[in-house]
Amino acid sequence: MPTNGLHQVLKIQFGLVNDTDRYLTAESFGFKVNASAPSLKRKQMWVLEPDPGEGTAVLFRSSHLGRYLSAEEDGRVACEAERPGRDCRFLVLPQPDGRWVLQSEPHGRFFGGTEDQLSCFATAITPAELWTVHLAIHPQAHLLSVSRRRYAHLCPQEDEIAADSNTPWGVDALVTLIFQNRQYCLKSCDSRYLRSDGRLVWEPEARARYTLEFKAGKLAFKDCDGHYLAPVGPAGTLRAGRNTRPGKDELFDLEESHPQVVLVAANHRYVSVRQGVNVSANQDEELDHETFLMQIDQETKKCTFYSSTGGYWTLVTHGGIQATATQVSENTMFEMEWRGRRVALKASNGRYVCMKKNGQLAAISDFVGEDEEFTLKLINRPILVLRGLDGFVCHRRGSNQLDTNRSVYDVFHLSFSDGAYQIRGRGGGFWHTGSHGSVCSDGERAEDFLFEFRERGRLAIRARSGKYLRGGASGLLRADADAPAGVALWEY
């Protein structure tokens, strides 16, 4: 299977939260560090790097500054070092409740404090030296077992999550990380939580919560008894094994979950590669052969469609479309034109893709009519987490409105009807637009929203008014943006 960016391991960025719920922050002015920020933004993001020398020490690099956290012998801390020296080496000591203690390796003292009174001079661990790890990545991803090189996916018949899939195909391969009570839950695509005995449960109970640990850039999930999740048995069932230290079997990568879509043509049939290499609209049900992985090129904003048979859609002679390309090229790129509830695709020959009378797709049209329009449905986000430029979308406390600047997120449920999406939140209320463009989450009836996939990993959401949903300085979600750009684009 060609890489071509299909399998992108996510760079793990995180925040560190102290005992007073404030985030470790790296300031540009004076390269000082403090713990004053109430939420996770750019200045609060850190990356863990292994120490270049041998041993268990690690380095903390500020994503914002690109510089390293250091602690001097007298306890003074800063984030000034452009290259990691001896004072930048820390030991991470995981505690039973899942929090971390950071110990200066050369000096043996512990790092902690409050507000701008941070130091690395403590000789004993108190609550002020305890840090919670909060992942800064988008929480919906694919989970890859490092030892088996297989992807985790929901097995509905066996009622389990198993790491036995060669490719993360379809909705079952989506895993959502839920941050709760300073720990993480693994949520399957049907909104159930993975318990440490391998069972799937509807509530995030204690045995369905895990402490995150990092080892050589990989993730491990430790349960409340100190054992680690691992694929077990021939089927690779995910459950806590016997090990109390993470080895290769207990390590996982998180990979970016690209949108997977189905397309319906004007004949009301699904576009498919079931009957060979020709891409045709000739099927009545949506299965793997009707599902395509869609990627958007960051520079051109054009998209590719990758099939379950291992080929990209590509333009061939006489305008035909076949799923045979093994590499991305100009002929595999399609320009998307959003037309309300429908989308039109323009191929590299400058012509629109249409459905011919025999159902085959071909890029032979100069204008868009009914045969050139397709319904495009996102199938691998039945539950949705949205992140904008300022943070995640989350219900505002004591209100029916939605915040767009939170470091915690709500999970919303998505349904689809005739080219439009309906979004349901906490308590079962639907999103709807109110007066002056406000977006509320307590609707009794579903309101239609249009999704436009504009950039890699980002979409625009269009309300019935024709305006786009945006974040902003007020932190409220509003439907009043004219263009699908900037604060009107959402990671999903």
UniProtKB/Swiss-Prot annotation:
UniProt keyword list: Actin-binding, Cell projection, Cytoplasm, Cytoskeleton
Location within or outside the cell: Cytoplasm, Cytoskeleton; Cell projection, Stereocilium
Cysteines joined through disulfide linkages: none
GO term, biological process aspect, one: establishment or maintenance of cell polarity
GO molecular function terms attached to this record: actin binding; actin filament binding; protein-macromolecule adaptor activity
Entry-linked SUPFAM superfamilies: Actin-crosslinking proteins
Main location: cytoplasm
This protein's GO CC annotations: actin cytoskeleton; cytoplasm; stereocilium
Family according to the record: Belongs to the fascin family.
Function summary: Acts as an actin bundling protein. May play a pivotal role in photoreceptor cell-specific events, such as disk morphogenesis.
Name of this chain's protein: Fascin-2
